[in-house]
């Protein structure tokens, strides 16, 4: 099979830094339990590897993270995820004398700082994101004047709640380009003075752009990544828009890929979310090229 590789692929720099910090936490605290508050990155395969190394996962899908944080023994080692977290988590960790390592992505940090800046300047903030995502929760928690816009329900946003004639608009770092465009257009129509910032990370933008520009003659698209990964699922949505004639598969790893019947296809586009490891990417690429 002919394979076209969409660049960039595999881990983004934020994910690499998160894993390096996790290893540092283990190395600097021998014999101590290290707790991951929520998935360090949104990829089950990567989290399983960390659990094999002795990390304890406090899963946001199974229990409220603030409640989970309360249950961690005082003096333990805590690793915050790459997706950001509310300030109240820092305060609780301090009262419990936890040894904290913060893997929050630098781009997410900058966005959180920008939101705080606008609030301090007396502005209201509209934040576009995925409901239930850790980054969205962290962003909205900064202040009461941060208004959440659900990426799946942009048209249902309560504009009447915005009193500021020049609010700031930011978005989750992993949102889709079309969602940002639609939200921006709607906001400009309703609130002409809105200050729009496309706060997606560069890795997200480049992956989405590369997929949109990929050869249209491809008859199958394989997107590597977890169903829990927002940036992966945005690639899936974009693939459906940009290549409507192609068959599209979203798989986590080689094991899942081998279960797909790829015999009818001859030209594949291969893309990946930012939490897919280089090893998984290379395994899948080699397999596709062997068909």
Name what the model sees in each region.
Residues 1-291:
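The feature marks the mature, well-folded catalytic cores of soluble enzymes
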